[in-house]
Design a protein with these regions (language model features):
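N-terminal capping segments
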Residues: 1-82, 125-127, 138-140, 146
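Short capping motifs at secondary-structure boundaries
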Residues: 73-81, 194-196, 221-225, 229-234
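...with weaker cross-activation on analogous glycine-rich loops/strands in unrelated enzymes
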Residues: 2-10, 59, 71, 79-154, ...
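Residues that flank catalytic or metal-binding motifs in active/ligand-binding sites
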Residues: 118, 125-127, 133, 210-215, ...
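Intrinsically disordered, low-complexity, charged/polar segments
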Residues: 168-173, 234-253
Length: 253
């Protein structure tokens, strides 16, 4: 049985592949044979628009829907060229159930999102995703990028794309453990929450900047320096941080 932390890492790894929302598909590569199969397996996929999308996809694109993404990982999906990308149907004691049945199998189901745990299922009628931490959810949806993607948990944070969910709970097919404390290190990608940075680790004059996605490039005398972490915005980030910042002013991405 996967731990919630392993489960989330495997889900996040799917975003590195080409994916497409295909109803009833749990990680199959969209080969010619699979395109033939999945354009006929469900009314949703039979619409001219979806047929065109599926047929246009390259053979190294993997098909998922919201519940099938979760089942695929729990069934051992590996991103291979085998029939189901390495997943074994109904393996590991995980049944083939839909989104609405999946939330019914969960424990600790609640509509209060203030203390949601990494790896919990998030649900709204007919749709599911998984909370991955830092106010983010991984889901497969035809909205936005039309595949597996990371979105903002709109119940507790703002971001784009964003969605508000109804309920969340712990899946019975995942072992939930406490997350190990994170020790920031050089090279880590973080979300900077502050609005200022400094020219040196002990500078007294702050300069305005915009927070956002950044990389830790240096750590100077932690526990002694006023601003021990040096951050530089990542390529494509809206952040403007490029300087020294305080401990506790950022979170792991």
């Amino acid at each position: 049985m996967l731990t919630n932390l392993q489960f989330v890492e495997k889900l996040k790894s799917v975003t590195k592949y080409k994916t497409l929302y295909v109803m009833g598909c749990f990680g199959a590569p969209l080969t010619a044979a699979n395109k033939e199969r999945y354009t006929k397996n469900h009314a949703y996929n039979k619409s001219p628009e979806r047929v065109a999308m599926i047929n246009k996809a390259s053979a190294d694109t993997f098909g998922f829907d919201c519940a099938c993404l979760i089942k695929a990982i729990l069934w051992g999906w590996k991103g291979t060229s085998s029939t189901y990308g390495g997943a074994v149907y109904m393996s590991n004691g995980v049944p083939d159930i839909n989104a609405d049945t999946m939330i019914q199998q969960c424990s600790g189901v609640t509509s209060n999102f203030s203390s949601i745990t990494i790896g919990e299922l998030v649900w709204l009628p007919g749709h599911v995703g998984v909370y991955i931490g830092n106010n983010k959810v991984i889901e497969c949806t035809p909205s936005w990028s039309n595949g597996v993607q990371i979105t903002t948990l709109g119940n507790v944070a703002k971001g784009s794309p964003s969605r508000e969910w109804r309920l969340h709970g712990k899946l019975p097919y995942v072992k939930y453990i406490a997350e190990s404390p994170w020790t920031p290190k050089v090279g880590d990608i973080v979300t900077y929450k502050g609005k200022v940075h400094y020219a040196s680790a002990n500078a007294t004059t702050a300069h305005s900047c915009t927070g956002g996605k950044a990389r830790i490039t240096h750590i100077h005398q932690l526990g002694k320096s006023k601003h021990p972490y040096h951050l530089v915005k990542t390529t494509g980030s809206s952040s403007t941080v490029h300087g020294w910042v305080d401990e506790g002013s950022f979170t792991k991405l």
